[in-house]
A protein has these predicted regions:
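Active-site recognition of the HExxH zinc-binding catalytic motif
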Residues: 72-84
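Metalloprotease/metallohydrolase-associated module, dominated by Zn2+-dependent proteases
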Residues: 2-68, 85-135
Length: 135
């Protein structure tokens, strides 16, 4: 079990692992933020990826969301971080988002599948965590 995780089944941690597998050279910082600015049309924004001039990437996820919605918004923003600011919501971004979804589900299967004996302690789970420096 990963002793660094507060929730042993954290979907945010699982998404982080998926992102690092798909985009190992891209670094980001993420925050929950209650006051994300509205978009240019005055519409509420639930997530934001900021690409600073110095190359730093910061992701913000609105705190008003359910966990399920926040995870989806986080994945959406991670896709932006993975493909870069110039991609917007084009095919390259969509592929990154879909790949994150697939990798996230693969990680879930590795970590929690009944085919792993016992669950939570499977070899693939331990290897994934060790490769990422979590254990």
């Amino acid at each position: 079990m990963n002793s660094n995780w507060i929730f042993k089944n954290s979907p945010f941690e699982m998404l982080d692992i998926a992102f690092k597998r798909l985009f190992p050279d891209v670094k980001y910082t993420a925050y929950f933020e209650p006051n994300i600015r509205d978009d240019e049309h005055g519409e509420k924004v639930y997530g934001l990826t900021d690409f600073a001039d110095d190359g730093e990437i910061t992701i913000f996820v609105n705190t008003d969301l359910s966990i399920n919605d926040a995870v989806e918004i986080f994945a959406h923003e991670l896709a932006h971080a993975g493909v870069g600011v110039e991609q917007e919501h084009n095919e390259k971004w969509q592929k990154a988002f879909d790949d994150l979804f697939d990798e996230y589900n693969k990680i879930g299967d590795e970590m929690f599948s009944s085919n792993v004996n016992p669950p939570y302690e499977g070899k693939a789970y331990k290897e994934a965590l060790e490769q990422l420096g979590y254990e």
